[in-house]
Amino acid sequence: MDLTENKVCLACGYDELTPVLDLNDQPLANSYKKSKDEPEASYPLNINRCNVCCHVQLSHTVNPDLIYKNYLYVSGTTKTYVDYMDWYADFVCERFNMFPQSVLDIGCNDGSQLDKFKARGLETYGVDPAINLWELSSKNHQVHCGYFDKHFSQSVDIITCQNAFAHNPRPLEFLLNCKKNLEIDGLIFIQTSQSDMILNNEFDTIYHEHISFYNIKSMMLLCNRAGLNLIDVVKTPIHGTSYIFIISADKSAPANIKNLIDMETAAGLYDTKTYIDYSQNCIDMVEKFKEKVEYWRNQGYKVVGYGAAAKANTFLNFSKVPFDMIIDDNPMKQGLFTPGSSVGIVGSDVLN
C-alpha cells in the first residue's frame, strides 16, 4: 500500500483531528523527472492539528520505501551543516555529563555526523534505509542499511536522530525501540526542524517526508507514552530554527519543561485561532506572490527561480505559478524537470 491515512494523533494517540491547510495533491518533492511528460503519482498533502496536544501532522503517509530507498539529500555537502555537526557532537557529549563510549545515529545519511562523534573517541553505529548512501556511511562506522525497528539491537550510551524523527509514521514504536537499545543512564537527542513554522506562517517545508511537526507538549506526551521523560529542550537556529529534545529513561522531567510549554502557550501555539490565521495567511501570501509575478510577466520579464529544493516544489505545486526555468548548481539536477510543475532545471551558466 502506497498511502495510509493518519486517523489518530501520532503524538498523544487521540482521534480528535482538525484540518489546518490543504496544499492539494502533490508528487513527492524530490521525484525529479527526465522529461516534462514523464508519468508521476501524486498524493494528498494536507496537515491536520490534534485538538488535544496541538501536534501537527500530515493527513496521509506515503510508503517510505518510495522516498528513502534512493535518497538524494546528502548531509555532508554543505559547509554550514558540517560546521553545525561539529557543534552538535560537542553539545551532545557535554550534555551527557560523563564520558560516553558509544553513539547510535538514526537516519545517519552519509555518516557525516558519525564522523564527528568518531573523532571524539566514541564507538559509532548508524541506521539508514538509503541503499545509495550505505557505501559512504559504512566506510568508518557500523551501519545497518534498513529501518530502525524492533529487530535492531545494539546497546549504546547515546542515541541521536537529527530531523529524521519527524519522518517516522510510528514515533511511539520508534521511542520504544530507542528505550530498548539505550543504556540505563543513556540519553536520546531528537532534533526536529521548523519549530516556528506555524507562528511564522511557513508552509514550504510541508512535504511527504515531513510527517510530523512537534511542539514541546506533543513531544512530552509522546515520551510519556513510551515510558521516557523529556528532560530538556534547546532551540538552535539550524533549519529555520530547530528543537533539540533531550530524553531520558531514568531522570524525571524538571520544572523548566512546564515553563517552556507556558512560553509556547503565551505565543499562541495552543490556540485554535492561531491555526485558522495560519491557513489564511499562507493562502494570502501565495495570492500576493501570484499578483506580483503576473505584473512582471506583463512587463515582458521572465520568471526564473534559484535553487531546485524540495521546499520550492511544495511552493510551485501549491501556487501553480508558471516559472520559465530554475537555476541550480547541483549537476545531478541539471537537465531534469521539477515534479508536478515540470519546470526545467539549468545551470547558472545561462546567466552569461
Predicted regions mapped to residue ranges:
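Conserved SAM-binding strand-loop segment of SAM-dependent methyltransferases
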Residues: 139-150
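A short glycine-rich, Lys/Arg-flanked "PGG" loop and its adjoining helix->strand segment in the class I
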Residues: 172-187
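Flexible, glycine-/basic-rich loop-and-beta segments that form/coincide
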Residues: 240-285
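Conserved SAM-binding loop of SAM-dependent methyltransferases across substrates and taxa
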Residues: 110-120
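N-terminal juxtadomain amphipathic helix
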Residues: 2-80, 234
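A conserved beta-strand element that flanks and buttresses the S-adenosyl-L-methionine
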Residues: 160
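Short, glycine-/aromatic-enriched active-site segment of Class I SAM-dependent methyltransferases
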Residues: 190-212, 216-218, 223
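Conserved class I S-adenosyl-L-methionine
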Residues: 99-109
